[in-house]
Design a protein with these regions (language model features):
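Short, intrinsically disordered low-complexity segments
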Residues: 1-2, 22, 100, 611
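C-terminal outer-membrane/trafficking sorting elements
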Residues: 3-6, 15-18, 564-651
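Repetitive helical segments and hydrophobic/amphipathic motifs
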Residues: 11-12
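Extracellular, repeat-based ectodomains that mediate carbohydrate processing or recognition
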Residues: 20-559
Length: 651
């Protein structure tokens, strides 16, 4: 495996890279089709009749440095889409689960073939694993099931994996076309009651293809996944919008239902929609407040700034029964975004929301939507050139190539936080991977993903980046990075680099973070080919990396945007800090309001609450802290219109 110059920036250390003025190398039309992730992989074989013992069970030639090997897949095609939730977790079960193409190491079974799927799970955070297969290719008409992703439906109050349900969806192929899709469910421990529903395109089913984005389960025993609505779903061409697939468990059976959303996309001169060909769906924990997000140009946008690839967002407040389109928004008015944009050819700023480095969404503890992705600069307002962005060249590897954002809704409108910047771009010329089915190189990107605690009060963002001084600034030597945001306290962790091995390939991040005391464990997998050829059509081994963890004490940086709801608080001063028996708060109010003062400890537990009626102008408030033990606390001051949080230390 090739290694370049290694710059060790430090494990568990904040990484700050200064972005210089970017050099513009030109413009490009972005590939919106995700075409490299639609290989039909027409092969179908019983690998116990064809594979040698060495292919199945011997020590691999290519070994992943970070993590412990726990399973494998027939090839890498099930790993290609980072927005598929292939890795998930459940707090009540203390379980992590990986959904994938069936393992090359499955015990000898005359029926098992390469088109099967597999659930692999652990209840001790990767120490031991169990698994069961699903989507029986042989008994279901030799359909080749592809791109599986999955979720755990766990009934309320249950802590026994025997009573939990696995659920998965994906497309299937005959080897030439995409002929339909499937939905599977079965009991978690032993695969009991396994049921796979087959939906053939053109036979009384929606024009759906590739139900593989955002699959997540919710407290109402439902699971949602987003697929595409196509004029020709068999060829996966003519993208029109989304087709949502919902599975609902009633305690004895799971029923699938469908809905579609077809936005009014702007069209270019060829009649093609200006949009990415995958969308995202997510709900609040109770399954009631939901969002469907497309990246594209809204046909009703009228200004240069809004005629850009932006979130086209639909919201539901009744569990997906109905959806309402949010108004067109000008994201160039958000300073965190506009600061790093390059003016388009007409002089306007055109924020261009990009999926090429990965993207994800989460609905937080307040029912607000969070979108993570990179944002580029749109180049033109010409009707046929809205899909063009600037191409930047790194200045000896020192220029940030892509800026990562959390763009979110709030009670006062849209806002954004700058998460970090990528110092490398997609690896195309220097990737180690090849696609034997096409004979070409296989590119690798940052695979940006999001994880959240069960209550959605903490969000974690993870991606890979490489040494910017090696291999022409391409992301060919990836290491894992992550950062956490506490939405209650308004503090985040430093961006932390967790690995230095430069080989963290094809990673998946669990969409659910497991919490134990003060520790937040984010499950991550990474994968490498077994035989050392780096061909994505060969067997890939999967490794579980358990080292991506944060502690409550890591949330030390107050992040930009915490004062986004603080419009009525003209100023705030808290003293002394550190304090002992009392803290004094000087609050300057723009207008009089009833205000709540709340102190929480480092575990998020409320230890003091007082309500006061404050007047316009300066207000002095004293809070008795004499009964608080020594440590770090957070003071949240909230009114009906404003909210602000500050950190204090009690001695």
């Amino acid at each position: 495996m090739k290694k370049g110059l290694l710059i060790i920036l430090g494990i568990s250390a904040s990484i700050t890279l200064s972005a210089q003025v970017p050099k513009i190398a030109g413009v490009k039309k972005v590939d919106l089709t995700n075409s490299n992730a639609k290989s039909t992989d027409g092969e179908s074989r019983n690998f116990y009749n064809t594979a040698t013992s060495n292919q199945r069970n011997a020590g691999p030639n290519a070994i992943q440095t970070a993590g412990v090997k726990f399973t494998s897949s027939w090839n890498a095609f099930g790993l290609l889409v980072s927005s598929s939730h292939c890795l998930t977790a459940d707090q009540a079960l203390n379980a992590v689960m990986f959904t994938h193409r069936i393992s090359q190491d499955w015990p000898a079974d005359a029926n098992v073939a390469s088109g099967y799927g597999e659930y692999s799970w652990s209840t001790n955070y990767g120490t031991t694993w169990d698994s069961s297969y699903f989507a029986d290719q042989t008994s279901l008409g030799n359909k080749r099931f592809r791109y599986p992703s999955g979720a755990i439906i766990n009934p309320a109050g249950n802590t026994n994996v025997a009573n939990a349900l696995n659920v998965a969806t994906g497309p299937y192929t005959s080897g030439t076309n995409w002929d339909g899709y499937f939905g599977n469910y079965q009991m978690m421990v032993n695969g009991a009651g396994s049921s796979t529903s087959i939906f053939d395109n053109g036979v009384g089913t929606p024009a759906l293809a590739f139900p593989r984005i955002s699959i997540t389960s919710y407290d109402d025993s439902s699971a949602w996944v987003s697929g595409g609505f196509y004029t020709d779903p068999i060829a996966a061409t003519g993208y029109l919008g989304s087709n949502l697939m919902k599975g609902k468990w009633d305690g004895t059976a799971l029923t699938w239902s469908f809905d579609s959303i077809l936005p009014n996309f702007h069209q270019d001169a060829t009649g093609a929609n200006d949009s990415w060909t995958q969308s995202f769906v997510g709900f609040s924990p109770n399954g009631q407040i939901g969002y469907q997000v497309f990246f594209g140009v809204d046909g009703s946008a009228t200004t240069s700034q809004t005629r850009a690839f932006s979130p086209i967002t639909y919201k539901s407040t009744n569990g997906g029964a109905t959806w309402n389109l949010l108004p067109v928004n000008d994201f160039s008015t958000i300073p965190a975004i506009s600061t790093y944009l390059i003016p388009a050819s007409d002089g306007n700023l055109k924020p261009w929301f990009d999926q090429s480095q990965g993207a994800d969404i989460v609905v937080d503890n307040n029912g607000e939507l969070h979108i993570v992705c990179t944002i580029s600069s749109g180049y033109s307002d010409d009707n046929d050139s809205l899909g063009y962005t600037y191409t930047l060249t790194g200045q000896n590897g020192t220029t940030a190539q892509h800026y990562i954002y959390d763009v979110h809704t709030s009670p006062t409108g849209w806002d954004a936080w700058l998460i970090d910047s990528l110092m490398t771009t997609t690896s195309t010329n220097n990737t180690i991977f090849v696609d034997g089915s096409t004979g070409g190189a296989f590119a690798t990107d940052a695979r940006i993903q999001m994880s959240h605690t069960t209550d959605r009060s903490k969000l974690f963002f993870a991606w890979v980046d490489s040494d910017p001084l090696a291999l022409a600034g391409e992301n060919a030597l990836p290491d894992l990075k992550a950062v956490g945001f506490d939405l209650v306290t308004g503090f985040k962790t430093p961006v932390t680099q967790f690995t230095t091995s430069q080989d963290f390939y094809f990673h998946y991040v669990s969409n659910v973070t497991l919490v134990s005391g003060n520790t937040y464990s984010i499950g991550v997998t990474n994968s490498i080919d077994r035989n050392g050829s780096h061909d994505v059509i060969t067997t890939f081994d999967h490794y579980f990396y358990e080292g991506c963890k944060f502690n409550t004490s890591d949330f030390t940086v107050q992040f930009v945007g915490v004062n986004e709801q603080a419009a009525n608080f003209g100023s705030l001063n808290i003293y002394p800090n550190p304090a002992k028996d009392q803290i004094n708060l000087n609050v300057n109010m723009v207008s009089g309001e009833n205000v709540s003062f709340q102190i929480t400890n480092s575990l998020g537990q409320v230890v003091l609450v007082e309500n006061r009626s404050l007047v316009n102008g300066n207000n002095n408030v004293q809070l008795n802290t004499s009964k608080l033990t020594s440590g770090v606390y957070f003071v949240t001051i909230a009114s009906e219109t404003s909210k602000v949080t500050s950190k204090i230390v009690i001695q």
